Amino acid sequence: MDGAAGPGDGPAREALQSLSQRLRVQEQEMELVKAALAEALRLLRLQVPPSSLQGSGTPAPPGDSLAAPPGLPPTCTPSLVSRGTQTETEVELKSSPGPPGLSNGPPAPQGASEEPSGTQSEGGGSSSSGAGSPGPPGILRPLQPPQRADTPRRNSSSSSSPSERPRQKLSRKAISSANLLVRSGSTESRGGKDPLSSPGGPGSRRSNYNLEGISVKMFLRGRPITMYIPSGIRSLEELPSGPPPETLSLDWVYGYRGRDSRSNLFVLRSGEVVYFIACVVVLYRPGGGPGGPGGGGQRHYRGHTDCVRCLAVHPDGVRVASGQTAGVDKDGKPLQPVVHIWDSETLLKLQEIGLGAFERGVGALAFSAADQGAFLCVVDDSNEHMLSVWDCSRGMKLAEIKSTNDSVLAVGFNPRDSSCIVTSGKSHVHFWNWSGGVGVPGNGTLTRKQGVFGKYKKPKFIPCFVFLPDGDILTGDSEGNILTWGRSPSDSKTPGRGGAKETYGIVAQAHAHEGSIFALCLRRDGTVLSGGGRDRRLVQWGPGLVALQEAEIPEHFGAVRAIAEGLGSELLVGTTKNALLRGDLAQGFSPVIQGHTDELWGLCTHPSQNRFLTCGHDRQLCLWDGESHALAWSIDLKETGLCADFHPSGAVVAVGLNTGRWLVLDTETREIVSDVIDGNEQLSVVRYSPDGLYLAIGSHDNVIYIYSVSSDGAKSSRFGRCMGHSSFITHLDWSKDGNFIMSNSGDYEILYWDVAGGCKQLKNRYESRDREWATYTCVLGFHVYGVWPDGSDGTDINSLCRSHNERVVAVADDFCKVHLFQYPCARAKAPSRMYGGHGSHVTSVRFTHDDSHLVSLGGKDASIFQWRVLGAGGAGPAPATPSRTPSLSPASSLDV
């Protein structure tokens, strides 16, 4: 039939699948309602003596342990079958007085006969209803052999004739309705209170219980998602309700934003290197070791609420100004850009400048030097690129003017005269003079003189400039030239029009690089360093622009973006491929910080070492050492990597690509030992079974491909396919015994699969409620449904990971935040500990093998954060106070 399918069958098949899925959900809901009524009638008709219906005060018969409410049968021996599922298995629940709550019934009376409660699940595996769960509420005893209805699967044909199908369907519904347990009195025993509306678990408009209290339902984009409650949970009120005792502390940030930013690398008086990535300003001391002044490693200023775009260091070498972009909040409302002035020794914010005064973001800023840094000039990213001057000590704006409609890439005060400001950018160099306004907000004036190129070719961009000790200015441009601008006498023709008191003209030109010059740096000995783009050269220039020495940056690090002078002859170089290099012109340079250059999605942690692997849109596959905070190795995948997972042995790693291709690499030799293509759509998840015998690959073609794997993980062969999802696969997890899979899809399905039994879909999802999972990364499921915020559209949570000790759940959301919840998290609006720092959607989170650290990936900011887990189940002592949520307050902007 497949070979004869016409071109129009694809949309028709998709529509049929969608209708089948909707019908299945509606049938389950109707069966629950009908079954409740049918069970009540059956008990009245078959089991209840007439005397028990005389009134509420009539005692129950001797054989009954509980009296029934008026007009209802007693709840002594209700029977239980598949609750709105396809497998009709009837079981009886012996009851006796017990605690109220959500349960499978009270405990059995003493002396009652008990039988094992396990029910056989599809594929031969067993699913225990009570064993292994704390305080099981009752014993489930089969009353009759399990009966399996021959309901045809989606996209499959039935063996029965068309005329018999309606009759069989009605028969199945009647059996299910007659056998479904009604937990009569369960709501009354709780005082009629819905646990989701109780003080311990505030109600939610998107979740509710079904009539029997055996499942929870939530809605995403109006779609109902039913999740069955494990048998060991008698009431949601007994589940954890507060935030976890564990907290996170930012341990290390991998990466440096050099690809698309400037003014991003400086050296402080303490010797620490300061730079930024995402919303974090990093203070790095080469050499490693514990953080803090006088030590090593990293410290972090985390007071910003969106991506940092530029930095400036005060002349005292201690205070730092950092400007951020505007961004939007989780509701899509624009946030206001701002400049923070903060102390690099204490990480305390000293001043917040320009809140509400800038548009879109802060593009460039600089401190004055002639007056000990009393003033700060700022250029924003509005269409007019407003130039403003501020009093640093009081946060007061002294002057403001529209600079130009063209891009402004750099700004700076003349170090000998704070009344002179220079800006450069697209096809311009402007010389500004500002006067007055000191002590009077907004009363100062700014006047402009354009730099005239005259006989010299006007470049497209002038990305950088530097002031020389003699007062001249050097500019680097997109043509690879260094121009020397000298002062000329005052312009007597324009004083009435506010002309500048002096003008600058080009006095010399030197061709320094092939391609654009991105950085100029004045050294302490008076020489100048220039960094080229296309040629990746770093050149030292003496008086008269005579080349003294040069070095070339290796190609895989990219072009020179920024230069800073360290201690002695040491230089720090930032590159366009987000690397930070350290060295000198004679000995060369080596990387101290490295990172990805494009959006990240793939993340997995090593099963026995503190290492993790990342991949993304830059086509690089990187293995990181979490102890040394260094890149162990990287290879070029040639294609976009979207997901990865280590084999349990750690010897190989599987990587899924965006073309339907997946690779298996040896982690020691980096050789590709397997290269397979499944379909032509991107792969969103790869996951080894806990015993390493299988590899599951979730694709955007709605299929989970299963492969048998050799003991060393190097060889694999197709075992089967799990087909039944109506949308692309997003997440999947293996059961602890390695026989079953739980999976989520793009249309919010939760499906279960019997892999060992032939990759069959388990239609009876209720039977999987007590199954234990080796990992928990599915974002939809009873144990984690409390992580979803109100009003979610289904895309708000990108990644989820349960810790190996099963104490906490980490969540990556679309609002740049990492959350920590208690596990299980099965209460609506569950509280969490929230951590900021990423400047883009957080795409993935994973715990290391010993739960000592958590790794999170930023999306478009290409950042990798390594968090230390502190507290009850973490690597260190719990802090005395709860974890702080980053904000603009000084106390919460620290993470030392």
UniProtKB/Swiss-Prot annotation:
User: What Gene Ontology molecular-function terms does this entry list?
Assistant: microtubule binding
Q: Where is this region: Disordered?
A: 50-209, 876-896
- The reply to whether Cell membrane figures as a keyword in the UniProt entry is no
Which residue ranges have biased composition labelled Polar residues? 77-88, 174-189
Renumbered ranges of WD repeats: 234-286, 295-344, 350-392, 398-434, 448-487, 504-543, 549-584, 589-626, 629-667, 674-709, 716-755, 765-823, 830-869
| List of residues that carry N-acetylmethionine | 1
Posttranslational mods: Phosphorylation at Thr-881 during mitosis is required for interaction with TUBG1, HAUS1, HAUS2, HAUS3, HAUS4, HAUS5, HAUS6, HAUS7 and HAUS8 and their recruitment to spindle microtubules.
- Bias (Pro residues) ranges: 134-145
Residue numbers bearing the Phosphoserine modification: 176, 198, 204, 883
Q: Which residues form a coiled coil?
A: 16-43
Which biological process annotations from GO are given for this protein?
cell division; microtubule cytoskeleton organization; mitotic metaphase chromosome alignment; regulation of mitotic spindle assembly
Q: Which SUPFAM superfamilies match?
A: Quinoprotein alcohol dehydrogenase-like (SSF50998)
* Role description: Regulates mitotic spindle assembly, microtubule (MT)-kinetochore attachment and chromosome separation via recruitment of HAUS augmin-like complex and TUBG1 to the existing MTs and promoting MT-based MT nucleation. Required for proper alignnment of chromosomes during metaphase.
Q: How is this protein organized at the quaternary level?
A: Homotrimer; self-association is mediated by the N-terminal coiled coil. Interacts with EML2 but not with EML1. Interacts (phosphorylated at Thr-881) with TUBG1, HAUS1, HAUS2, HAUS3, HAUS4, HAUS5, HAUS6, HAUS7 and HAUS8.
Which PANTHER family does the entry link to? ECHINODERM MICROTUBULE-ASSOCIATED PROTEIN-LIKE 3, WD-40 REPEAT PROTEIN
Protein family according to the UniProt entry = Belongs to the WD repeat EMAP family.
Protein name listed in UniProt: Echinoderm microtubule-associated protein-like 3
Q: Which organism is it from?
A: Homo sapiens
Gene responsible for this protein? EML3
